[in-house]
């Protein structure tokens, strides 16, 4: 006699907790992003405030990746694949214009062979060097479509919404890049 395989139990509380935490990360990131990019002005407190904002934004950017990772595994909102995909798309899009579907397709290969030449998230030729890994990661996941989306967002921020270039680099680009390390 074979034992029946039980279906995973969908836990509404887990979904609520996951979505609440994801919402807090996205909202916190958005508030700091809007302040830093559009309202922060150089002044007497810049040296004290700007590094703190960059540090928190960097952590929030890591949070975007963590939320997307949970969404890829379906653990953000168990039993709700479309909701997981929607939240994953939002967080990766805000993070750096990455396509959730592209990363989700390659992600199982990472778990199948972590830290090996077959791991798309690992740079086997020079495993301890950050720059070659970083460039390899971007070549793997950041294509022309992502570049077009990111370029459009930057142009809208600069010319449509009046963001200062230094603020965009400091409070959006720098935290996103730092969070990848």
Q: Which sequence ranges carry the predicted segments?
A:
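Membrane-interface helix-boundary motifs at transmembrane edges
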Residues: 42-45, 74-83
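Topogenic membrane-insertion module of multi-pass membrane proteins
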Residues: 1-47
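Membrane-embedded alpha-helical segments that form the functional core of polytopic membrane enzymes
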Residues: 43-64, 90-98
């Amino acid at each position: 006699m074979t034992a029946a395989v039980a279906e995973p139990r969908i836990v509404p509380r887990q979904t609520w907790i996951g979505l609440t935490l994801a919402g807090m990360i996205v909202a916190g990131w958005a508030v700091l992003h809007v302040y830093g990019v559009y309202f922060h002005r150089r002044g007497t407190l810049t040296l004290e405030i700007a590094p703190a904002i960059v540090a928190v934004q960097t952590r929030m950017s890591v949070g975007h990746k963590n939320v997307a990772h949970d969404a890829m595994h379906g653990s953000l909102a168990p039993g709700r694949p479309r909701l997981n995909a929607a939240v994953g798309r939002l967080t990766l899009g805000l993070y750096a214009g990455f396509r959730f579907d592209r990363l989700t397709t390659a992600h199982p290969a990472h778990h199948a062979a972590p830290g090996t030449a077959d791991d798309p998230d690992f740079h086997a030729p020079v495993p301890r060097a950050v720059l070659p890994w970083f460039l390899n990661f971007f070549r793997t996941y950041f294509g022309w479509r992502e570049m077009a989306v990111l370029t459009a967002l930057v142009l809208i921020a600069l010319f449509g919404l009046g963001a200062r270039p230094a603020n965009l680099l400091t409070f959006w680009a720098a935290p996103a890049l730092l969070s990848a390390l």
